[in-house]
Amino acid sequence: MIKEYRTIKEVVGPLMAVEKVSGVKYEELIEVRMQNGEIRRGQVLEVQEDKAMVQIFEGTSGINLKNSSVRFLGHPLQLGVSEDMIGRVFDGLGRPKDNGPEILPEKYLDINGEVINPIARDYPDEFIQTGISAIDHLNTLVRGQKLPVFSGSGLPHKELAAQIARQATVLDSSDDFAVVFAAIGITFEEAEFFMEDFRQTGAIDRSVMFMNLANDPAIERIATPRMALTAAEYLAYEKGMHVLVIMTDMTNYAEALREISAARREVPGRRGYPGYLYTNLATLFERAGRIRGLKGSVTQIPILTMPEDDKTHPIPDLTGYITEGQIILTRELYKSGIQPPIDVLPSLSRLKDKGTGAGKTREDHAATMNQLFAAYAQGKQAKELAVVLGESALSDIDKIYAKFAERFENEYVNQGFYTNRTITETLDLGWELLAMLPRTELKRIKDDLLDKYLPEGK
């Protein structure tokens, strides 16, 4: 039953306190009817006895305490879902933003989703090809995984996000694949970049986009990733599609949480973020996965900018605890002109060994991955030594490793944002680079694989 009250007690920032209420639930949707007839929407953030704290999506400016009324709608924020969402652009609250018609929903779903029973989860073990060598070969993404990208302010993470959205696919052509893209608190220029890129490259045809701009209300920023994940779960578990969810920028999401927490006068945690930041992020990231008996899957790539490039900042720190690895972009590689500037050594995909090998990628995947890691690490060490002691201090084998590291960065990692490599092309390129080294140095690869794949004459 919808209830209406005229008992607004206080307005503070985006928050409004309503008293003498009954039967109100956490996260229930509300409508505020103002004295001029305007209607604004909001959400219940807290309930104590007969008092409710609500946040207004459009802000509280102009609300008159005596002449405004509040209606509690009896349900949480919902998203109307349908397969017709594919190819469309929505705002952070799921309203069409592309001048297209309203979606005719098949059903309405609570954006908070439902917890996946751990027993019902299926283990992620199928390869997703992004077309980016540093990810596909060395930090493999598998269906159902959550693999974040840790970037820094000014680094090209938006170009990387667009590239993954364009290029990502599953190798089995019979499987339906879709991308759900959530832009959180981005600038107007960034929004234009994403929409233009998706339209020009045709990526929009298999994508659902949710765009929340920096000047939109903070509460909408909280809702945007939940809208995206609700759409993804519908496409995955009810329509049998493999869905990749890209969310950028999760730092803006955490800042919105901090803003709301401060308005509620909560006791702050580390660096002013609320003490529940970890559990709140987990409610998003744990919605990735596969369910036994269902065909579809939800894979997540959340992208965040590390304030001051600090990996120990609460946002990347807590994200790392919840997710299954990280892809790290570095300023050093970016300044060297490497695009995308992925530093493969500190990057990690904890599930990479589950989605590789014969029948998934190729039999030589794991061995060449380990050898490339070892050779690049040794090459970087040799280059650092040459800076300190001079190149003449290097042994002959160290000079080879230093050249290997240089070629690895310039040819393997530096593929640009519009080159789409298949996993076969990436593996072959890895062998071409490993052929620089004496065969005796390739100790992490079995002889039968060396005989089969190492280029002639090595």
Swiss-Prot record:
GO terms for molecular function: ATP binding; proton-transporting ATP synthase activity, rotational mechanism. Induction: By increasing intracellular Na(+) concentration. InterPro entries: ATP-synt_VA_C, ATPase_a/bsu_AS, ATPase_F1/V1/A1_a/bsu_N, ATPase_F1/V1/A1_a/bsu_nucl-bd, P-loop_NTPase, V-ATPase_su_B/beta. SUPFAM superfamilies: C-terminal domain of alpha and beta subunits of F1 ATP synthase, P-loop containing nucleoside triphosphate hydrolases. Keywords: Ion transport, Sodium, Sodium transport, Transport. It holds the Pfam family ATP-synt_ab. One of its GO terms (biological process) is proton motive force-driven plasma membrane ATP synthesis. Disulfide bonds: none annotated. Involved in ATP-driven sodium extrusion. Belongs to the ATPase alpha/beta chains family. This is V-type sodium ATPase subunit B. The gene is ntpB.
